[in-house]
Every structure is written in C-alpha cells, then in structure tokens.
C-alpha cells in the first residue's frame, strides 16, 4: 500500500481485452513526489498498449460547510461530495443532484427555501459522509506504517472491519 500509493490505494480492473489501472495518493504522504510519478511507476509494471493516461485531484476532506448561497447551489466535487475513505464521487454527486433538482423545482413551484437542499442532503447522506471521514482518518494513521505491517494487519480476521470502513459504515459499534 504505502510504497505504491502512500495514504491511498491502487487498482487493476480487467475489462475484456483492456484494463483500468490507476491509483490514488494523499499529497501530504507523497514525500514530495507528484501523483503522476507514482502513477507512471505503477502503470509501467503492466504490459500492453496505452489508450489513455491522465491524472487529477479529488476533494477528499468531505463536504463544504454551505451548499447554498442566495440562488446558487453547489453539487458534486464543488460541494466536496466525494467519500474521503475511497474517493467515490459519481454516485454521491448523482444523489446530490437529484436532491438539488427536487428542491429547486419545489423552490420555483412552491417557494420552498433552497436551504432545504442541504437539510435533505444531511438527512440522507450525512451519516455516510461522517463514517467515510472517520474511516479516512483511521486509514491515514494506518497507512503511515510500512507495507510489511499492513500485510499482517490486513488479514481474514480484520476483513469485516476493513469492509465496514471502505463501505462507509460504522466500524465500531460504539461510534
């Protein structure tokens, strides 16, 4: 984990005759190296023709404090709707877009306050985002350990705990 993608993760998803290969890193754990340098090093381990190469950054700190200002609403990456624990954002943005669209329609037709968008978002996604942020924080601490330690720590006995963290559920029954 740490040597390939510090504070993040790497993936190889086979798709018929091609593969999606990539990684995510935490900038503060990257030791001054660029995302591109980590990506190049990882991708070059695999054979085959390259059809696309790109790199970008995600807002991994969770949602911003205010989605609505006046008649403007923010959705998706602009509102920080990316799960800090795993970088997932498409589904989260779609949920935000659906809620925003409903509230905007109600605002136009019935005068509903646009702030209702943030209230509904919190009601539907607030716990998921909080759990994801907690998982990210714990993961950030764990990923400071060397790879050999992580290989021991991530084992069949901890699988359930890790799965709960990655899927943004409460990792412990206490909090």
Which role does the model predict for each range below?
Residues 102-175:
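C-terminal helical "tail/cap" subdomain of flavin- and related membrane-associated enzymes
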Residues 6, 27-104, 109:
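FAD/FMN-dependent oxidoreductases across multiple families
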Residues 1-35:
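Conserved FAD-binding catalytic core of PHBH/FMO-like flavoproteins
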């Amino acid at each position: 984990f740490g040597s390939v993608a510090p504070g993040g993760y790497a993936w190889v998803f086979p798709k018929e005759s091609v593969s999606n290969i990539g990684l995510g890193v935490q900038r503060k754990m990257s030791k001054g190296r660029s995302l591109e340098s980590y990506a190049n090093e990882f991708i070059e381990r695999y054979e085959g023709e390259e059809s696309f190469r790109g790199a970008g950054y995600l807002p991994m700190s969770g949602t911003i404090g205010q989605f609505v200002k006046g008649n403007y609403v923010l959705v998706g990456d602009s509102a920080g709707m990316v799960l800090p624990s795993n970088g997932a954002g498409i589904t989260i943005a779609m949920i935000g877009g659906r809620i925003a669209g409903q509230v905007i329609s109600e605002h136009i037709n019935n005068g509903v306050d646009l702030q209702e968008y943030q209230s509904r978002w919190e009601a539907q996604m607030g716990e998921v985002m909080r759990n994801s942020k907690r998982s990210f924080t714990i993961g950030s601490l764990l990923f400071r350990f060397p790879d050999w330690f992580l290989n021991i720590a991530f084992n069949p006995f901890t699988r359930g705990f890790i799965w709960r963290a990655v899927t943004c559920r409460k990792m412990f029954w206490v909090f």
